[in-house]
Amino acid sequence: EDHWSFRRSNYFAHIGNEVRNVTENAGLLDMSAFAKARISGPGAEAFLDHLVANKLPKKVGRVALCHALTERGGVHSEFTIQRESATSFYLVSAGAGQRLDHDWIKKHMPDDGRVRLDNLTNSIGVLVLAGPKARDILAKITRADLSNAAFPWLSGQMIDVNLAPAMAIRVNFVGELGWELHHPIEYQNHIFDALMAAGAEFGLKPFGIRAMDAMRLEKSYRLVGTELSIEYAALESGLHRFVHLNKGDFKGQRQLAEWQERGFANAMVTLEVHDTTDADAIGGNPIMTEDGTVIGRATSGGYGFRLGK
């Protein structure tokens, strides 16, 4: 039972144990709550290319992190997009934002039938296997080649996991070697049990969302609704790698370019806080100078167990 506090509570040590095991061995996280959809049809590529600021993946199986901007140039939604074929794309986004994200897609879809949206959230489960021993564990129960050469970062392949089908995507939100295993939900118990059995000798243990959040903070990975917001320009939020102003027309492009010309008032940075004892920033905290002047706000916060600060 959680004991809520503005200081480090009774779950602090358990989060640390989970982070250390993921970092030293491997961990397994259930992220089936992800919002999942398929965008398909003869107009799918052109539609998505106009909706997001990043370039779409060109090769089948490849993955890109993409952001849908508002008409002002802020960030409305974030999608992991995998190309399935010339006319089909698999989209993954935050579970808490499913209605927001899918409504945004529907709002901008053409009405000529050339683009179709299928909600796959309830039919597909997701297990995240992460840690330095993730490859050794998965290799025990699949025939797929998991080497870097055959299975590079930001790519996905259909594989068998103890004979169950899964789309293995080499991405995760914790900054360790690993795969997201997207599978028909009816196979989830089978895949979970197979992974736990295969990982027993490697120290595999489940970990939770709080441990994931602690690790993503250390990597400066951003979340929609905290670091990414409609209030701030996408480039204020540090999304330069994912926003291509010269790729061609996309929603919010002109407004973002004009905002950039005027100059940004804010910048997203990662701050290290030293000499803390039993309390950490939790997000939403004001950042003030010694005389009490507010100069910013902490979007997220927490203790970095891998860094020890």
Show where each model-derived region lies:
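Glycine/proline-enriched, intrinsically flexible loops and inter-domain linkers
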Residues: 1-309
